[in-house]
């Protein structure tokens, strides 16, 4: 009998739960259509579930006065939010409060005279939104995705460093350490979300203790990809999937212990589907042997 262990911290975080709840509640209160500006969270299956309820992801082409638009959990630049309100749309801000804290941090550092380094993925919606707030408070800064990106920061005497909320803690520390070697004054505001840290620590603990590790989450989810990379370093038999349909029977041949973790945008119902499918695969292999 296979032992399936779900990581202590896995799946929906506070910010994602809040965004999904706001989307569901908006359906009861809206007179017009309900949209999200882009996918509300990075999980295609949950986005599709909300779409079936009547919450449609959009880039804004079909918005009409009186419609409801929900700002995604990752946030958007302030100028975009202002443009939505000017169109006569009802705007519901589902930006994660922890992401809002990053917006406040970059403006605080700007007011204090620091050049801002944002450790994150350059094309991630959260980073794009945060850069919008940095512009709005007349700040200057760069995004650091790899250590090769820090060059511009080293030209400044005072550097303030923040992180995308779902950033890898080890890489964040590495960037801080490298910049501190070369810059006269460094101020660090650790804006990595506690939920991200807990999920990463849970994976570090579980991955070495199992034969196979399954990481569930959207392929476009930065925090899920980081869980996968962390797990893969500790357990080569790590696989990143979105749904139970992607599970391959050969992954589980001769396996006794399977670990499961999931990104912050992965709902419980998908985790349960994956767990059930693994049980079916392993029981089928026992019968055939």
Curated annotation (Swiss-Prot):
Family to which this protein belongs: Belongs to the IspH family.
Binding-site residues, (2E)-4-hydroxy-3-methylbut-2-enyl diphosphate: 42, 74, 124, 165, 221, 223, 265
GO molecular function: 4 iron, 4 sulfur cluster binding; 4-hydroxy-3-methylbut-2-enyl diphosphate reductase activity; metal ion binding
Residues annotated for [4Fe-4S] cluster binding in this entry: 13, 96, 193
Gene3D superfamilies xref list: 3.40.50.11270, 4-hydroxy-3-methylbut-2-enyl diphosphate reductase, catalytic domain
Positions of isopentenyl diphosphate binding: 42, 74, 124, 221, 223, 265
Protein name: 4-hydroxy-3-methylbut-2-enyl diphosphate reductase
Record has Endoplasmic reticulum as a keyword: no
Binding positions for dimethylallyl diphosphate per the UniProt entry: 42, 74, 124, 221, 223, 265
Top-level division of the source organism's lineage: Bacteria
Organism: Aquifex aeolicus (strain VF5)
EC number(s) stated in the UniProt entry for this protein: 1.17.7.4
NCBIfam families reported in the protein's UniProt record: ispH_lytB (TIGR00216), PRK01045.1-1 (NF002187)
UniProt function note: Catalyzes the conversion of 1-hydroxy-2-methyl-2-(E)-butenyl 4-diphosphate (HMBPP) into a mixture of isopentenyl diphosphate (IPP) and dimethylallyl diphosphate (DMAPP). Acts in the terminal step of the DOXP/MEP pathway for isoprenoid precursor biosynthesis.
A GO-annotated cellular component: cytosol
pH profile of the protein: Optimum pH is 7.0-7.5.
GO terms (BP aspect): dimethylallyl diphosphate biosynthetic process; isopentenyl diphosphate biosynthetic process, methylerythritol 4-phosphate pathway; terpenoid biosynthetic process
Gene for this chain: ispH
Active site: 126
Cofactor(s) demanded: [4Fe-4S] cluster
